Regions:
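Acidic/aromatic-lined carbohydrate-recognition and catalytic surfaces
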Residues: 1-167, 171, 175, 188-237
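A structural motif
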Residues: 36, 178, 186, 323-324
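Short glycine/proline- and charge-enriched loop/turn segments
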Residues: 52-61, 196-198, 245-255, 344-349
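Core domains of carbohydrate- and sulfate-ester-processing enzymes
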Residues: 102-144, 262-281, 348-375
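Loop/helix patches that line or flank the sugar-binding groove of alpha-linked glycan CAZymes
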Residues: 214, 218-220, 231-232, 241-243, ...
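Beta-strand-rich binding/interaction modules
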Residues: 441-458
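C-terminal beta-strand-rich structural cap/linker in extracellular carbohydrate-active enzymes
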Residues: 461-479
Length: 479
C-alpha cells in the first residue's frame, strides 16, 4: 500500500500555512497507522508552479518545503517505520526559468542542445495528440517545443550529454535516501519526430532511454523501485511497465469507478475481466500498480457523486484485487474535488485535519472549496467515531494490510448473479471467493462455507448467508 502525498497540502510544520517536510515527518505515524507501507512523494524540487511539475533546479529542494536536512530526517523517520519512499520526477521538461533553459536561449552549449528549437516553419503545424493544441511556444522571439504548454519547455533527449545529466540527477536523489522513483510522462521522452515534423510517440526510443536510466539506478541501489506513468492502451503500457517493474493500471481505475458509480454489476464484471486479464498476460514481466484516483483525476467521492458507500465499495474491490495499490492523500477522509485539465487545484486541496479548518499543522495555502469547514470530512470529526467514513476506510485498509497474499493472487474466474459479483482467486492461501454486492438489496451467497465480511454487513438469515447492499465479503478455502 502506497500513499500519494502532496506536501504543500498535507501538514504544516513551521506555522506558515504551507505543508512541508517537517510537517510530513510529524505525521508519519498517521500514515503508518493507516496501514501504508510506502509513500509516493509528489515533486519537491524548486519550481514556480504550485504542483511542482515544472522544475527550476533538479538538485534543490523547494525552500517552502524545507532543506536537505529536513528531507533526510523525513526519510529516516519513514524508514524507521518501515515505509519506503519514492520521489516523483518530472524529467520530460523544465520550467522556462530553469538555468538550463535560460542558457539555451542565449545559445550556450551544451544547453542549447538540451531543448528543441524550431528548425522549420512547417513544424509549427504540429499539434498535440489529445486536443489538437499548439506544441510550440515563443520565448523572446524563439520557438521552442513545449508539449505541455509554455510553462514547461520539453527537454531534447537527442543530446547524449543530457542523458548523462539526468543520470546525475538520479544519482543525487538516491544518495539522499529515496527508495525509487515515479517517472512522470514516461512515454513523452521522444514524442516529436524531427524527420516528419509531427508529434509522434517513439516508443522504442523511449524504452531504450528508460532501460539505461533504470539500469543506472539499479547499479547504485539493486532494490530500487520504479513506477511508470503511461496513460495509454494495454499494449503500450505493457511495453513500458516491463522495464520499470510496476505500471499504473489506468484502464482499471477508470472502468472500475464507472461501473461502481452506476451500480452496474455487468459493467464491473466486464471491467475486471478486460483490465485484469490484460495484466495477467504480462504477469511475468511486471506488477500492476492499482489505484482509483491521483492528482490528475477527480477524487473518489466526487466520482461517486458524493455517495460514500459507493466509494467504499470501489475501494474494497480495488484492495481485494492482485497488484500493488496506491491511494491518494485525503481519500481516507472522503475529500472531494473535480478534475479540471487546466486548473487542478481543487483535487490538491489542503488535507482537512480540523472541523473548523484551523489548528496546529493545518495547511492554509488554498481556501477550502469542496471541503469547507464543518463539512464533516475532517480527521477531527471522524477519528474514533464508529461507522464514520474514515474508520470504515481504515478498516478496509487494515484488511488488505493483514492479507498481503492478495497482492500476488491469480483471478481464476469472475461471475455475476443479478447485482452480486463473485471473484474466484488463487494464491498462497489456496482458493478464495470474493463477493461484492453492487445493488441496494440484500444478496444471498451460494456457499456452505463461512465467509467473512470486509465492508458493510453480512448476516446469517434463515440458514443462509445474506450480504447487504454495497457490502463485500471473502471466503478462504484450503487455507
Amino acid at each position: 500500500l502506497f500513499y500519494e502525498l502532496y506536501l504543500r497540502s498535507f501538514y504544516d510544520g513551521n506555522g506558515d500555512g504551507i505543508g512541508d517536510l517537517k510537517g510530513a515527518e510529524m505525521k508519519l505515524d498517521y500514515i503508518a497507522k493507516l496501514g501504508m507501507e510506502g509513500i509516493w512523494l509528489l515533486p519537491i524540487m524548486q519550481s514556480p508552479a504550485y504542483h511542482g511539475y515544472s522544475v527550476t533546479d533538479f538538485f534543490a529542494i523547494n525552500p517552502i518545503y524545507g532543506d536537505l536536512k529536513d528531507l533526510r530526517n523525513f526519510l529516516y523517520g519513514a524508514h524507521k517505520r518501515e515505509l519506503k519512499v519514492i520521489l516523483d520526477l518530472p524529467l520530460n521538461h523544465t520550467s522556462p526559468s530553469h538555468e538550463w533553459f535560460l542558457k539555451a536561449l542565449d545559445g550556450e552549449k551544451p544547453y542549447r542542445d538540451w531543448y528543441l528549437f524550431l528548425q522549420s516553419e512547417e513544424w509549427l503545424k504540429a499539434r498535440r495528440h489529445w486536443d489538437n493544441q499548439q506544441v510550440w511556444s515563443n520565448y523572446s522571439g524563439r520557438w521552442v517545443y513545449a508539449l505541455f504548454g509554455p510553462g514547461s519547455p520539453d527537454l531534447n533527449f537527442e543530446s547524449p550529454s543530457l542523458w548523462q545529466q539526468i543520470k546525475e540527477v538520479l544519482t543525487f536523489w538516491l544518495s539522499v535516501g529515496f527508495d525509487g522513483f515515479r517517472f512522470d510522462a514516461a512515454k513523452h521522452i521522444f514524442d516529436f519526430s524531427i524527420e516528419k515534423g509531427i508529434c509522434e510517440y517513439q516508443h522504442s526510443r523511449n524504452i531504450a532511454f528508460w532501460k539505461e536510466m533504470t539500469s543506472h539506478c539499479r547499479a547504485i541501489s539493486p532494490d530500487c523501485l520504479f513506477v511508470s506513468e503511461v496513460w495509454d492502451d494495454a499494449r503500450i503500457v505493457d511495453m513500458y511497465s516491463s522495464i520499470f517493474g510496476i505500471g499504473f493500471n489506468f484502464p482499471l481505475a477508470e472502468d472500475l469507478k464507472l461501473a461502481i458509480a452506476s451500480r452496474n454489476a455487468v459493467s464491473l464484471v466486464k471491467a475486471l475481466k478486460t483490465d485484469m486479464q490484460r495484466f495477467f498476460r504480462s504477469r511475468r514481466s511486471y506488477e500492476s500498480g492499482t489505484f482509483l484516483t491521483n492528482h490528475d483525476m477527480t477524487r473518489l467521492v466526487s466520482s461517486m457523486n458524493g455517495d460514500r458507500d459507493l466509494a467504499l465499495l470501489a475501494l474494497t474491490v480495488l484492495l481485494t484485487l492482485p497488484g500493488l495499490p496506491f491511494l491518494y492523500y485525503g481519500e481516507e477522509l472522503g475529500m472531494e474535488g473535480v478534475y479540471d485539465e487546466y486548473f487542478n487545484e481543487e483535487q490538491l486541496e489542503p488535507h482537512l485535519w480540523y472541523e473548523n479548518g484551523y489548528g496546529p499543522g493545518q495547511t492554509e495555502w488554498k481556501a477550502l472549496g469542496k471541503n469547507r469547514p464543518h463539512s464533516g470530512v475532517s480527521f477531527q470529526a471522524q477519528s474514533g467515531i464508529a461507522g464514520s467514513y474514515f474508520e470504515r476506510f481504515k478498516n478496509i485498509l487494515r484488511f488488505r494490510r493483514d492479507n498481503p497474499w492478495l497482492r500476488f493472487t491469480t483471478i481464476k474466474s469472475i461471475s455475476r448473479k443479478k447485482d452480486l459479483v463473485r471473484i474466484n482467486l488463487h494464491g498462497s492461501k489456496g482458493n478464495a471467493f470474493l463477493y461484492h454486492n453492487t445493488g441496494s438489496s440484500r444478496a444471498t451467497l451460494d456457499t456452505a462455507g463461512t465467509p467473512v465480511v470486509i465492508n458493510g454487513t453480512l448476516e446469517r438469515l434463515r440458514g443462509r448467508w445474506s450480504l447487504a447492499g454495497l457490502s463485500s465479503a471473502i471466503e478462504v478455502l484450503n487455507e
